[in-house]
């Protein structure tokens, strides 16, 4: 998680289930007028979103921002591709990693920081099915241990 993150608006829980997150980056979002109002209202879905580097710029695809209800004719397209703002060195580093096989850029969450919408972008490797099963077993074991301690303290 980036330092000093503010109010979390939306999280991509599926990304943590489907990928190993190696690094995270904080990126600004280039938005149109009513998009920031819809984000502040929490009308964002990151479930199928992904990011790509194209011509030295990072773009996020399939991020759904619902139209703002009071936006009438000035509303935006909910699934348009949006530009992400990163430092040039970060973009060059991401280009190097994404050209390697198995790495992809996944949006992890959207949050507000000092009034601006920011996105936590993760550099991720895909998990295999057995990795997912192993993570589920570990999670269940931790839950059982916590339950046992809780029951023990009640006595």
Curated annotation (Swiss-Prot):
Organism domain of life: Bacteria
Could you say which residues form the signal peptide?
none
User: What is the name listed in the Swiss-Prot or TrEMBL entry for this protein?
Assistant: SsrA-binding protein
Checking InterPro entries in the record gives: SmpB (IPR023620), SsrA-bd_prot (IPR000037), SsrA-bd_prot_CS (IPR020081)
**Swiss-Prot/TrEMBL keywords:** Cytoplasm, RNA-binding
* Location (main, coarse): cytoplasm
Membership in a protein family: Belongs to the SmpB family.
GO CC, one annotated term: cytosol
> Which CDD domains has this protein been placed in?
SmpB (cd09294)
Could you tell me what this protein does? Required for rescue of stalled ribosomes mediated by trans-translation. Binds to transfer-messenger RNA (tmRNA), required for stable association of tmRNA with ribosomes. tmRNA and SmpB together mimic tRNA shape, replacing the anticodon stem-loop with SmpB. tmRNA is encoded by the ssrA gene; the 2 termini fold to resemble tRNA(Ala) and it encodes a 'tag peptide', a short internal open reading frame. During trans-translation Ala-aminoacylated tmRNA acts like a tRNA, entering the A-site of stalled ribosomes, displacing the stalled mRNA.
Q: Does the keyword Transmembrane helix apply?
A: no
A Gene Ontology molecular function term of the record: RNA binding
Q: Which BP terms in the Gene Ontology apply to this protein?
A: trans-translation
Which locations, inside or outside the cell, does it occupy?
Cytoplasm
Q: Does the keyword Ribonucleoprotein apply?
A: no
Taxonomic lineage = Bacteria, Bacillati, Bacillota, Bacilli, Bacillales
Q: Which SUPFAM superfamilies match?
A: Small protein B (SmpB)
Kindly list the cysteine pairs connected by disulfide bridges.
none
* Gene3D superfamilies associated with the record: 2.40.280.10
């Amino acid at each position: 998680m980036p330092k000093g993150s503010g109010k979390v608006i939306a999280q991509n829980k599926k990304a943590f289930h489907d990928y190993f997150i190696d690094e995270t980056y904080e990126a600004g979002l280039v938005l149109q007028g009513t998009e920031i109002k819809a984000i502040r209202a929490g009308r964002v879905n990151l479930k199928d979103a992904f990011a790509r580097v194209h011509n030295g710029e990072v773009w996020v695809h399939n991020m759904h921002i619902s139209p703002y209800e009071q936006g009438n004719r000035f509303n935006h397209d909910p699934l348009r591709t949006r530009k992400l703002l990163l430092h040039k060195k970060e973009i060059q580093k991401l280009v190097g990693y994404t050209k390697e096989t198995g790495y992809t850029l996944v949006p992890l969450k959207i949050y507000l920081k000092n009034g601006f919408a920011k996105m936590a972008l993760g550099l991720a490797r895909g998990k295999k099915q057995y990795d997912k099963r192993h993570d589920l077993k570990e999670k269940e074991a931790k839950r059982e241990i916590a339950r046992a301690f809780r029951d023990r303290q009640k006595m």
